């Protein structure tokens, strides 16, 4: 069985939660719980409420995601 590709979509940070997790409102209006990817964490990139980000979502569970990029 081949692994399903993840869905990439843009969103805006609504709220910062403990353990480097965030509530993100996606372009389609869905609100997901997202954590920070390792590369962003490694380079100490700050993510604040109101920032525009790119989120990867698994097709198996669309309520959780991973933040992969913060737009400038």
Curated annotation (Swiss-Prot):
One of its GO terms (cellular component) is cytosol. It holds the Pfam family eIF-1a. Residues 1-72 form the S1-like domain. It is found in: Cytoplasm. Signal peptide: none annotated. Its main location: cytoplasm. InterPro entries: NA-bd_OB-fold (IPR012340), RNA-binding_domain_S1_IF1 (IPR006196), S1_domain (IPR003029), TIF_IF1 (IPR004368). NCBIfam families: infA. Component of the 30S ribosomal translation pre-initiation complex which assembles on the 30S ribosome in the order IF-2 and IF-3, IF-1 and N-formylmethionyl-tRNA(fMet); mRNA recruitment can occur at any time during PIC assembly. PANTHER family: TRANSLATION INITIATION FACTOR IF-1, CHLOROPLASTIC (PTHR33370:SF1). This is Translation initiation factor IF-1. The gene is infA.
């Amino acid at each position: 069985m081949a692994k399903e590709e993840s869905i990439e979509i843009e969103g805006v940070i609504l709220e910062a939660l403990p353990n480097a997790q965030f509530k993100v409102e996606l372009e389609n209006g869905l609100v997901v719980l997202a954590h920070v990817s390792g590369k962003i964490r490694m380079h100490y990139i700050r993510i604040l409420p109101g920032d525009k980000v790119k989120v990867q979502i698994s097709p198996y569970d669309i309520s959780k995601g991973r933040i992969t990029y913060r737009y400038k």
